């Protein structure tokens, strides 16, 4: 499919579709370099060619890191841009907007002022019922103060797990899960067992088996 709206093989995308795609793509270093390039010069034996990126925000807004302009008959002027400030990464998409560059800048300024990056889960050791429990990944979110208050972090444990994976930690906001990761342990000793003698731990294990 071509991405255009007309013809037998037409397809359509929403601004939300474009925002998801661009937010994912900007994490690719090559893509980010391409869409973030303001100008490029190519010299041949006969002539020198200079191309200028049509995304004017790259030059007029210092936090813009990439994006793509476009035009179709139905959507008219389309613009997808990405911006980053103080760890907060945002994507703005507009269709049929005659003031798209100005609107994008205004939206960035509005949400950069209201959002902050929070580290919800830190990589490494976590507080749980097992000693030496840890996770392999950290998780950060850009949130308003009110959203941060509504974040829910939950830890669940697997019953009688014989592996080093003893549970999961999950993060949700307003009922939607945004992060889930396994909890590992280096030594299968629960915190309450640390001060038990060898025989006390053995008896406890036998009782669990019975």
Predicted feature descriptions by range:
Residues 9-210:
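Domain-terminus/edge residues, biased toward the C-terminal soluble/receptor-binding domains
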Residues 1-7:
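Surface-exposed aromatic
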